[in-house]
C-alpha cells in the first residue's frame, strides 16, 4: 500500500478515487492533482511507479489535509463558541447551525428523542 500524507492509500482503486481517502481531498481536488501531475486518473495505485507516487506526495503536500485540516476546523468552531455569536451558541447547544428548522426534524443534530417526564 502506498502511504501519502500519513494515510495508507488503497492499491486496488483508481488514482482519483484512492486520493479521496485522504481527509481534505475530494473528487474535484483529486482530479486537479492528477491533471497537474500528469498521472492518468484511470490507473490503479498498484500500477504506479515509486517516482509517480513521490510526485503525488509532493502535490498533496501543497494542500492542508488530514491532521492540520481537522485542527483548523476544530479551532474555527471553538473560536465561534468563545465569541458567543449565534453560530457558536448553536454549536454549543448541539443544534443545527445554518438556519434549518428544529420544531420537527433535526434529529441527527439533536440526537434521539428524550421522553417527557410527568
Curated annotation (Swiss-Prot):
The keyword Glycosyltransferase does not apply. GO terms for cellular component: cytosol; small ribosomal subunit. InterPro entries: Rbsml_uS13_C, Ribosomal_uS13, Ribosomal_uS13-like_H2TH, Ribosomal_uS13_bac-type, Ribosomal_uS13_CS. Residues 94-118 are annotated as: Disordered. One of its GO terms (molecular function) is structural constituent of ribosome. Pfam families: Ribosomal_S13. Keywords: Ribonucleoprotein, Ribosomal protein, RNA-binding, rRNA-binding, tRNA-binding. Gene3D superfamilies: 1.10.8.50, 30s ribosomal protein s13, domain 2. PROSITE patterns: RIBOSOMAL_S13_1, RIBOSOMAL_S13_2. It comes from the Bacteria. Part of the 30S ribosomal subunit. Forms a loose heterodimer with protein S19. Forms two bridges to the 50S subunit in the 70S ribosome. Located at the top of the head of the 30S subunit, it contacts several helices of the 16S rRNA. In the 70S ribosome it contacts the 23S rRNA (bridge B1a) and protein L5 of the 50S subunit (bridge B1b), connecting the 2 subunits; these bridges are implicated in subunit movement. Contacts the tRNAs in the A and P-sites. NCBIfam families: uS13_bact. This is Small ribosomal subunit protein uS13. It comes from Erwinia tasmaniensis (strain DSM 17950 / CFBP 7177 / CIP 109463 / NCPPB 4357 / Et1/99).
Amino acid at each position: 500500500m502506498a502511504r501519502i500524507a500519513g494515510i495508507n492509500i488503497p492499491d486496488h482503486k483508481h488514482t482519483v478515487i484512492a486520493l479521496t481517502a485522504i481527509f481534505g481531498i475530494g473528487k474535484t481536488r483529486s482530479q486537479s492533482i492528477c491533471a497537474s501531475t500528469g498521472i492518468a486518473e484511470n490507473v490503479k495505485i498498484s500500477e504506479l511507479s515509486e517516482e509517480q507516487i513521490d510526485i503525488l506526495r509532493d502535490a498533496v503536500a501543497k494542500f492542508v489535509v488530514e491532521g492540520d485540516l481537522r485542527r483548523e476546523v476544530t479551532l474555527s468552531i471553538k473560536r465561534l463558541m468563545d465569541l458567543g455569536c449565534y453560530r457558536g451558541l448553536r454549536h454549543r447547544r448541539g443544534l443545527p447551525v445554518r438556519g434549518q428548522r428544529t420544531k420537527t426534524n433535526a434529529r441527527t443534530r439533536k440526537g434521539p428523542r428524550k421522553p417527557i417526564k410527568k
